[in-house]
Amino acid sequence: MPVTKKSQILVVRGQVIFPFVPFSLDVGRPRSRKIIKALKTLKTKRLVLVTQKFTGEQNPEFNDIYHVGTLCEIDEIVDVPGVDSKTVDYRIKGRGLQRVLIEKFSDADINEVSYQLLNSTVKDEANVDRFLQRIFPEKEEIEQLMEGAEKFLELENISKTVNVPKGLKQLDIITFKLANLVPNTESIKQAILEENEIANRLEKIIQAGIEDLQKIQDYGRSKNKETEFDKLDSKITRKINEQLSRQQRDFYLREKLRIIREEIGISSKKEDEVASIRKKLDENPYPEAIKKRILSELEHYENSSSSSQESTLTKTYIDTLLNLPWWQKSKDNSDVKNLIKTLDKNHTGLDKVKERIVEYLAVQLRTQKNKGPIMCLVGPPGVGKSSLAKSIAEALDKKFVKISLGGVHDESEIRGHRKTYLGSMPGRILKGMTRAKVINPLFLLDEIDKMTSSNQGYPSGALLEVLDPELNNKFSDNYVEEDYDLSKVMFIATANYIEDIPEALLDRMEIIELTSYTEQEKIEIAKNHLIKRCLEDADLNSEELKFTDEAISYIIKFYTREAGVRQLERLIQQVVRKYIVAMQKDGIKQETIDVNAVKKYLKKEIFDHTMRDEVSLPGIVNGMAYTPTGGDLLPIEVTHVAGKGELILTGNLKQTMRESANVALGYVKANAERFNINPSLFKKIDINIHVPGGGIPKDGPSAGAALVTAIISSLTGKKVDPTVAMTGEITLRGKVLVIGGVKEKTISAYRGGVTTIFMPEKNERYLDEVPKEIVDKLNIIFVKEYSDIYNKLFS
């Protein structure tokens, strides 16, 4: 006995959905949108699709629809813009599973129906074979069809999802795929769908095909009679033959069509567009494959209705191909001296970075090849990565294109969307090439570390083809569908964190790290660039508003905490705005911004940099921290009280720093006698290590040497000079290991009033990154083992 089931129903207009056949539908009616919106939240996306009898009815009832439909699996739901900005329509893609008989609408929900599954039948196999042979005269063709249907079942896993008797599955697939090809009305297709018996279904398919063939034959026979149209046709033919002798057939037909329109007085904007495109193809050296593709699409465009969606989509595709640069090339400036001059003009500081950039580009300019690794500028926000890339483009006379990759999670953003999708377009790479209008621009791939993966694919994987010099001469965009040569493009990437760059991309990159600016560099940047830009934006000149070096330094120290200069620029803009208000309100004509004026306009200070203590106490030592905004002093406090030998860690210390504290204590215990500490003392006391600033998480191993020193100082009562700071990872054997952030730590220590720094010996090679004027004012002592520090401080 048939089983009645329930499902949501989607009523479609002008289309019959067959089982086993993929389909694509646009959903825009309010009732239908509601169904699809609810379906998006479900794991299994199935519903019944049925055709509406009368397309004009907006809210069809049970009698307005055919009662045989198809149970479908929805594979994809895409949001598309609605008819107005307040609505969202949908495009759905899926495939039919099995025919169903719709019994009634649900009483509780008009969008829900009761249905029964319909199975096909075979009454006479001889009839089935006879009809199949009418369509496919060769027996081998039928055998291949049956084998293909069986493979389709296996690949699509149909047998597990569709309740069809075993012997009928292949015949069902063949008949419904044939039915989908019938170029006929929906009523005839619906009749085919409703037919249960396979032989009868095949007969209807053949009949539908013959009817179309009959119309064509009837039309041909009617042309045998001489008519005025025939006479006109003969006249046109003679006229063209006089004008053209041995032209190609397609040109002959176009001329014929043009003269027909002249005879009846019709002019077409589309004709003008087509003529313009053909002229453009003739006059420009487009690649042959692209010319061929455009001409093919142009033929579709000519034959389509101007008001149809297909016409618009085809024209958009043609325009995309035409507007892409295929041969246009700008002339590069290969003068390395000009490159150095431009970088120095636009960027204060960053000497090592600029040196590496010049070395990297000098080779490429000499060889005229982009075969090396891609340059990737890595550094904190605001240190000038993007502006460096722009300066390189300026120096080389290259067109500059910036593509932001932050938050990109869909591979189609890089490769483009396939033309079958509504609203499809090329990916960001080819859209950037269209903006550049040349084949050799400079592409900035900004924030390459911010890409993410999702079920829409892996954009980082798509970028591999873009950046790999062995592959990018044949880059494939899903929308364009033709190979595009990116080998002449110079790519530069930027990132904030090197560890977030996908490994496969990292392997293809030349990493150039940008560190934070020093205070003096920030002052120079403000004087040479930021203040000038802020004054120009406010229509002021340097005579009306001036900034002293002390004022800029005060803003940097007490109102910003950043590696770059973005916040500094915002604060300068704020001062400028407040000055303009004062100028209009109080009649001020000019002003020099000093420290007092900064306090007046920016109010109370926001930050305080950590300064060394003025008085030394046992158990207090200056460590050195490296932060995303630069560096800072890291005071470490150790005290001990009577207890049971426990180690207490406070100050929001993370795992690595906690381990470092345990290693430091272990080293002190193992060498207690050497440090003049009674070993038995450790069992009688609890040691508390505290790092002030509990609201800020602290991590890393580089405070090891400072932790050992603070523990020894606390247990022996010996004080450490507050003008001393130290950094270095400690081991249980007392080795002082290399650390990072030498430049930032050294600058922050100097700013905090430190005069002597203990640093791992292997970090000496990084000291050239620190400004010479700071190094000259510090006593930097390089150590291999902790004993070197102990002998200097406590012996």
From Swiss-Prot:
The recorded induction information for this protein reads:
By heat shock.
* Residue ranges of domain Lon N-terminal in the record: 7-213
Keyword Hydrolase among UniProt keywords: yes
A GO BP term here is: protein quality control for misfolded or incompletely synthesized proteins
Subunit structure, per the record?
A: Homohexamer. Organized in a ring with a central cavity.
Q: Which family does it belong to?
A: Belongs to the peptidase S16 family.
> What name does UniProt use for this protein?
Lon protease
The organism that produces this protein has a lineage beginning with: Bacteria, Bacillati, Mycoplasmatota, Mycoplasmoidales, Mycoplasmoidaceae
